[in-house]
Amino acid sequence: MAVGIFGLIPSSSPDELRKILQALSTKWGDVVEDFESLEVKPMKGAMTNEVFMVSWPRKETNLRCRKLLVRVYGEGVELFFNRDDEIRTFEYVARHGHGPTLLGRFAGGRVEEFIHARTLSATDLRDPNISALVASKLRRFHSIHIPGDRIMLIWDRMRTWVGQAKNLCSNEHSTEFGLDDIEDEINLLEQEVNNEQEIGFCHNDLQYGNIMIDEETNAITIIDYEYASYNPIAYDIANHFCEMAADYHSNTPHILDYTLYPGEEERRRFICNYLTSSGEEAREEDIEQLLDDIEKYTLASHLFWGLWGIISGYVNKIEFDYIEYSRQRFKQYWLRKPKLLSFFPS
């Protein structure tokens, strides 16, 4: 039985959503005009937004339904990024063939093209063939030129988040996470990795749920650019490696298993695929340098998402144990720091 779209998708502006659908109906011309016949399926695994797949029957019943994606923004996300900047990035990346097309915006959400591909699973990231495709696609993504200054944002963004976390959280959590000392950790870490390094347009949230594969062509699509910005490419790869510890579709999606963090052979293979995807041979010294930089940047990833989790725990109503997630990210930071950095006190 079809479920009415306006009854299932939470929206503060149902009239705006209706206008978008009416415009699409006119543009396409081959879909039924009864919006109550649209079928809505919630997509699992999102930790910031609510995402819905909409199947829209066509007038010719022998044709497949058209599909689109409706994304309803989570509460408090304006603390993490500027939504207008994210939309501009979304549209620019789409124009350059790297993601879905924006079909419309409404207050509190947007409508996107539905990508006819399969979202990767946690185990897919360990498949050498899929991993090679992801590495190659990430290299091309990093080469996207977004208009504006090529300024890396990771450090200032974390400093801003420290202040936001302090303002939001209880004294108990502030003490538990040592928020008064985290800015010093950010400063020291920035000094340690402050060498000459390649800057690219980074996704900054390359978990498996943001990667799709067309199983007929093996084409990879990277989606969701809310945290995208210029950053060191080593940071983006480090964050991707850290995400291999997560399974957001398990019964305990907030629990991270760092025994799944890729070993040196797996990391080296990814880096080689990344560097050689442009047709050039990878030099051993470049591989070694990137290996070293990536490991140090895993610490930045732990701080980044640890702070994100603290803030999210106070502003986001999605069913996810953000605070416990943060505990694990900070625990990993303090565990790995003395092994990875040359002069920091442990």
Swiss-Prot record:
Transmembrane segments: none
Catalyzed chemical reaction(s): choline + ATP = phosphocholine + ADP + H(+)
Keywords: ATP-binding, Kinase, Lipid biosynthesis, Lipid metabolism, Nucleotide-binding, Phospholipid biosynthesis, Phospholipid metabolism, Transferase
Induction line: By wounding, and salt and osmotic stresses.
Positions that bind ATP: 71, 207, 224
Source taxon at top rank: Eukaryota
EC number: 2.7.1.32
GO MF annotation, one: ATP binding
Sequence similarity: Belongs to the choline/ethanolamine kinase family.
Class of this enzyme: transferase
SUPFAM superfamilies (UniProt xref): Protein kinase-like (PK-like)
Name of the protein described by the UniProt record: Probable choline kinase 3
Pathway: Phospholipid metabolism; phosphatidylcholine biosynthesis; phosphocholine from choline: step 1/1
Source organism of the structure: Arabidopsis thaliana (Mouse-ear cress)
Function: Involved in phospholipid biosynthesis. Catalyzes the first step in phosphatidylcholine biosynthesis.
